[in-house]
Amino acid sequence: MSNVLDKTNLHELSIAPKISTHDEKLYECTKCGIFFHRDSVESATEINPHENLGEVRAVEDKPNNESIKVDERGTCNFHFIDEHHGKVDGINTEYDASKFKQILENYSKLTEPNQLFECLPSNLRPPSDDEGSDGKSHDPQSNGLGKTDYTVPTIIPPTVLPVLHDLAQQMVKAGHQQELFKTYRDIRRAVLAQSLEKLGVERHSKYDVERMNQDVFEAKIMNWIHYIRISVKLLFAAEKEICHQILDGVEPFRDQSFAEITTISFGMLLSFGYAIAISRRSPEKVFVILDMYEIMIELQPEFELIFGSKPCTEMKEDALNLTKLLAQTVKETIADFEVAIEMDATETVVMDGSVHALTSYVARYVKFLFDYEPTLRQLFQEFNSNDPDTKLKSVMTGIMRALRNNLDGKSRQFEDAALTQLFLMNNVYYIVRNFRREEAKNFLGDDLVQTHRRIVQQHAKQYQTISWNKILQCITVQSSKSGLIKNESIKKTLVKEKFKTFNSQFEELHQRQCQWSVSDVELRESLRLAIAEVLLPAYGSFLKRFGPMIESGKNSQKYIRFTPEDLERMLNDFFQGKNLDVSPKR
């Protein structure tokens, strides 16, 4: 409904003022466009909220040339002279202080949650029972960061607001501004508190928060995010709107009233945020605290607009302080996480050399942080406004370094040096694999990703050296030093010994390393290929050169147990994490 009503609309609503005939001079009410006679308007009749508001008539108004203003002490700055001794054209204009309270109480009802949900953008409304949820992944759009439209709810019928405004002006003129202030504040404050209580807002202390299990903790925070968004964007916005209409021109009571109406409710909302921020920190909490930080950033324009007046300064500062405290909590929690990684002393031994639980946990943790990249950049800008990107990359580098240091310590639990290298290769590669995507490079920096790739290659080469150099020596003949060549012939016994040693060592490697695990298919295949490229040509050359000498004798299969094809097939068993038959299939 428009704030401007013409005379026709007024007559249709039956609240048109009755113009006196003894004075033809009219004045215009600049706020609503209604024309009043300078000396008189019709006094209000009793209000019954169950009857049509059209029966409500305008309250007696008798202004002079001065506008109504109230100073800081609540004192009116004009003199009111009733020339007609309480009568205007025979109409009773005696002031009745109960009308304002009666109408305000009758039309001030709590706003039901469903009404509020209807005022939200569709993507922020609670899902219906049959819609379900599609997971917990963080989506900035779903948290209200996108451009979305909100509809301020109607908390008092628009047709009642001009009536309340006129009554409020009457009370001020009669010198009852303090009664007006107290009546309006108490009624609206109680209704606002009831609306928030019906919505689900409740007070929690730091100790309440620390006793919550993780699921309850997260649910409470997600509810709080919805509550504070609804409260600020809908309830507080609507409250300020009607306050400005009803108490228009009654400064400073208007802003002071709004401040005192909302301060308790807003304080209760913020108290939960403060309780979260100062409660015991843990790495798992950082994501929901980031969600809280995001909503506080999202609501900053509303804080500036809704709490922009001087009486609301403290509320605006409390909101800003909570935002900073949440940012500090996130920063300190991530720093704690880095320390916790390096100090992790879990004795879980990964016997097959596969990815350790700590590695998968850290990688998953950092991947979740990727989803908050814009938020983290903004957050770190509060602490390093010159270069938040460098600070963010430094934090991520510290986490990766802490993980590698811890893995180095855990790798010492293996007695087999080759398994140590395989374990480190697996774990560092797991990080690289999870950080391939472009967002990760932007988040961590390409240098960090490339550094970890080189570390993977180093561990792979060290594994090959430790595992395969010894066996390759069995099938390598150096004529100048070995002493095996004499008169262009090789003694069969020495050749047989070399074959036997090779067979024994390969079977041992096969038996042991087929139980080791390289879970990533790409890494597993590349490692097998690297082994095959060295082993198969060397064995093939040795077999081609010395095989005929053994095959010409008895029991040749005792010494030549494998063909190059057998070795290639058996290499495919490596790193499967299984117990396999080591006998070659001929």
UniProtKB/Swiss-Prot annotation:
The protein, known as: Exocyst complex component EXO70A3
GO BP, sorted A to Z: auxin-activated signaling pathway; exocytosis; gravitropism; intracellular auxin homeostasis; protein transport; root morphogenesis
Signal peptide interval: none
InterPro entries assigned: Cullin_repeat-like_dom_sf, Exo70, Exo70_C
Record carries keyword Metal-binding: no
Tissue: Confined to the outer layer of the columella cells in the root tips of young seedlings.
Keywords: Auxin signaling pathway, Developmental protein, Exocytosis, Glycoprotein, Membrane, Protein transport, Transmembrane, Transmembrane helix, Transport
Membrane-spanning parts: 258-278
Pfam families (UniProt xref): Exo70_C
Glycosylation sites (chain numbering): 65, 106, 321, 487
Record text on subunit structure and interactions: Subunit of the exocyst complex.
Region (Disordered): 119-149
Annotated membrane topology: Single-pass membrane protein
Disruption phenotype: Alteration of root gravitropic responses (e.g. delay, auxin-dependent root directional growth and larger variation of root tip angles) resulting in deeper root system architecture (RSA) and enhanced drought resistance. Disturbed PIN4 distribution in columella cells associated with a perturbation of the auxin distribution pattern and an asymmetric accumulation of DR5 in the downward peripheral layer under gravistimulus.
Cellular-component GO terms for this entry: exocyst; membrane
Intracellular or extracellular location(s): Membrane
Additional remark text: Associated with natural variation of agravitropic root growth upon auxin transport perturbation with N-1-naphtylphthalamic acid (NPA).
Keyword Transmembrane helix: yes
Superkingdom: Eukaryota
Assigned protein family: Belongs to the EXO70 family.
Described purpose of this protein according to its UniProt entry: Component of the exocyst complex involved in the docking of exocytic vesicles with fusion sites on the plasma membrane during regulated or polarized secretion. Involved in PIN4 exocytosis and gravitropic responses in columella cells. By monitoring PIN4 distribution in columella cells, modulates auxin repartition and subsequently regulates the root system architecture (RSA), thus being a component of the auxin-dependent root directional growth (ARD).
An example molecular function term from Gene Ontology annotations: phosphatidylinositol-4,5-bisphosphate binding
